[in-house]
Amino acid sequence: MTNDEVISLLRQAYGDEIETVMNYLTNSYVLQGLRADEVRGSLRTDARQEELAHAEQLAERLSELDARPPASMEFEATQEGLQPPEDSADALSVIDGVIDYEEEAIETYRALIRAAQEADDPVTEDLAVEILGDEEAHRAEFKSFRRDFE
């Protein structure tokens, strides 16, 4: 893999994280009902503290590599499964959407780790490993929510 491939994956991950912030925040305000309280809280916390921090870390790394993160007109929104449900009490569809997104993010960060290893870029590799751990923890949390809703 080349440095160009690392930069491409960093840009993709940055766009995904920004889109996730928007979708997590939106869902945290759209969901209603007592059973959704914990899900709403987790979405808000993750959007504000983790996903936005990931985007900032990715943007910083892109800058260090003399590249720039994509702006809003440069990336395509793809998180169809994270769109707010028609029924605001349908927390299960949001939970499933989060699990699906986290699995996609995990694959992106694994690809970034491989690309960084092949490009001999240990700084990007370390960053991707760190973020991968966060994404795996969040997926586990939402799988737990899923079991509670079954």
Segments from the language model and where they lie:
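Iron-associated oxidoreductase/ferritin-like identity signal
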Residues: M1-E150
